[in-house]
Amino acid sequence: MKRQFAKIKIAAENLSRSSKSDSKDSELEAIERQVDRYRDTIEKIVRKLPALSGGGGSGSGSSEEQDKRTKKNSHYKIAQALDESAKELPKDMPLQKVLANCGELEKTMAECIIESELETEAKVVRRLKNILDKEIQEISTLKRNVSRTLQEYTSLKRSHEAAIRLEEPAAKVNHIKSQQEECELKLEKERDAWAAQMLELIAKEDEIVSCIRDYVLNQRNYHERALQHVNASLARIQDTIQGTEKSRFGTSLKEHLTSTNREISYIVELCCCCLLEHGLEEEGLLRVGCASTKLRRMKHALEAQHVKTPLPLDYQDPHVIGSILKLYLRELPEPLLTYNLYKDFIRIAERHSEAERKTEIKAILTKLPKENYANLRYLTRFLSIVQQRSALNKMSSQNLAIVMSPNMLWPRIDKSSNAPADYIGQVNSSSAANIIVELLISQWDYFFIGEVEFYLTLQKQKLFVEGKSKSNSSNENLDRNDSEVMESPRYGTLRRQKANAPSPPTTNGNGIIMTTSQTSHRPHAKELFPQQTPEKQEKPAKPPLPNLPQFQSPAASQPTQTQLEPLPPPPVTPAKPVPMTRTQFFGLDNLPSPTADRKSTDSIGSFKLKPDVPQKPLLPKRPTVLGVGVPKADGKSDDEGGTTPTQATIDNGNGSVRFKTEHFLDKLRQENGETNGTREVSSTTKENNHNHDPPATAADQNQQQAQPQVTTPISPNSFQTPKRPTVPAPPPPTNWKSSD
């Protein structure tokens, strides 16, 4: 038991110490650290470089893999987008050619990239990965063997020491010792193999360096191939640009003429020919400006090559064409008379004799470049023709020189310097340029020889759209005296498509409408009013007049015989009784309304408004006698309150009511037995008087007229409520006769 316990103790010690590495000498530790650095470097390079394809690099089976990888490349996707854009454009456009060329270049670049990646995988990544898989893996295996043998050797060594300490038999101690010696020899061999393998890897450092060098060479080859394709594509693009017509505005005259293979600038020829054909008689030609929007529109249309002959209607205004000519000359990088000869022209202008000026100008014109001389000759000939029509266009040679000289000669301006502008020099130079240009226009035959052919590339009489107005000038129709109605010219816009509204038919002096036969001699009348058979429309019958009251009818003004005859009495309808209110019962309806005690200086908010008591209508009283009450001075009776007809109303009705009343009274007297004509109050009359008032007399009536009626004072601060209208009673009969 004691021996077994000792063995278990030794095994436990060995087990606890198995993870601990044996102490190494300094040489192996340094070699191992260097190998670890190599391993880390190679692993990073292999991880970052393109991964190996499944096909194994080059070979017959790698073409499909290469195509798949090419289509996944970003350059190939860009090429597809460029090709799609190029297909949507016409083939004669420079942009379409450039897009197609760039698409081919991007595809080639994608193929070059994939080829470079495959070469990198084959020449660099494969070799580095072989070092990792073989060399580094072998070193790791040897290292594990050394660690295992070292652990075994340590265990045997401790067992030998324990056997000696426990005084084991000699045979057993010798056996353990022999095992220890054999393990030690094995450990030394494995250490040597491990060290040799690591040193071999270190010796292969040149191979690792050569792999990196091959990667760089591969990159150079890729960029060289790509550069060749880029240069070839760039050359084709440059040829396309050279074959394309340059932008006309802001381009040097020589470059524009070279790219278009012309002798005269296209803008100069187009403007001059258009103005020669339609515009020489335009007043203020080349002097009158135009709208900036129309100028910009035509300029950019010419730059975009959107405007071609025949010119559309929007680009036929002679003032716009003249402004385009001046703008083109002004935007040239170098003036038409050049910077080099600027001082010579200024010096010539200082000569006092015109003959000396002409001689020196003719000598200096020979120094102009060929392109400038040809265009100057062409332009000045056109200006001289315009000057010949100065009686119509009001543009003499002096006026033309003032307008055109700033666009043909100006000094060089140094934009880099911060020196102040020489305004005096600019004024002097402009006056000198006016003198030079005026001589070139007025004395054109002296400076130039031969005649100018204006229509070099354009066709005469085909510069404008046929069937439409070829001139939009402002004085086109000033001299017409015909009677035909003309529409106002519309400049730069299409004519109205919608037909105009027809004018009303004309009338003669008597207000009679003229028929189509009377206006048949007028062409515009025929157009507006075509001859048609007029249909007679029947006039509707007049409606019958409304039933008016008898006192408002026209016949009421003159009493007829039928009005004087007795008429049957109208049916008597009793008046509807009006209930008496509480206010009327107590006699409070005639009390004055309380008003606000305020001064003129008080504000509206300094007192409280006291509204008036609502006024109730008076209960109508029946007359004391059956007759019409005597009218008062104000034309109102006591019982009617201004609602029943008064005597004035009867008189205004021209006696119509009076005749009816007399007839009714006569019949009433006959029924009551009143034959003597005296006014006696009957019992019937007294019974009908519910107020039991005595009969009204003339004195009472005068007293009532003199007695003032109590009224409610109305103040501006009181609120009045409208009175309820009273129900008028029918006019009762009277027992008195009229005086007539």
From Swiss-Prot:
Residue ranges, compositional bias (Pro residues): 566-577, 725-734
Modified residues (Phosphoserine): S469, S473, S593, S715, S738, S739
Residue numbers carrying Phosphothreonine: T595, T721
InterPro entries in alphabetical order: AH/BAR_dom_sf, BAR_dom, RHG17/44/SH3BP1-like, Rho_GTPase_activation_prot, RhoGAP_dom
Amino acid composition bias (Basic and acidic residues), ranges on this chain: 659-672
Marked site (Arginine finger) residue numbers: R287
Bias kind Low complexity: ranges: 694-713
Any matching Pfam family: BAR
Boundaries of every BAR domain copy: 13-246
GO CC field: cytoplasm; neuromuscular junction; plasma membrane
GO annotation, biological process: imaginal disc-derived leg morphogenesis; negative regulation of actin filament polymerization; negative regulation of small GTPase mediated signal transduction; neuromuscular synaptic transmission; positive regulation of synaptic assembly at neuromuscular junction; protein localization; regulation of actin cytoskeleton organization; regulation of Rac protein signal transduction
Location of region: Disordered: 49-74, 467-740
Compositional bias of kind Polar residues: 506-520, 643-655, 673-686
The Rho-GAP domain, residue ranges: 251-448
GO MF, one annotated term: SH3 domain binding
Record keywords: Coiled coil, GTPase activation, Phosphoprotein
Role of this protein: GTPase activator for the Rho-type GTPases by converting them to an inactive GDP-bound state.
Name the record gives this protein: Rho GTPase-activating protein 92B
